[in-house]
Amino acid sequence: MNRIKEVLDRKGIKQVWLAEQLGKSYNMVHSYAQNKRQPSIDDLYKIAEILNVDIKELLVSNKPEQDTKWNQVK
């Protein structure tokens, strides 16, 4: 899973613009943003460079979040 859509929204950047900068079709970038497809590591790195963000910002952690309510009950 990736956070491309969230970063684009936060920066006010359109998927069409990213597609042009990346040299990919709008449909491909849209599928990345919707998490229907995942970009290659190379493309993810290019996207991070284009958006001027750390590549980590585009990734979703696989670690489960701690349920704070559950921890409060214990």
Residue ranges and their predicted role:
Residues 6, 12, 31, 49, ...:
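Short, charged recognition helix plus adjacent turn
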Residues 22, 32, 43, 52, ...:
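Non-catalytic effector/regulatory segments
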Residues 2-21:
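Short basic helix-loop element that most often maps to the first helix and adjoining turn
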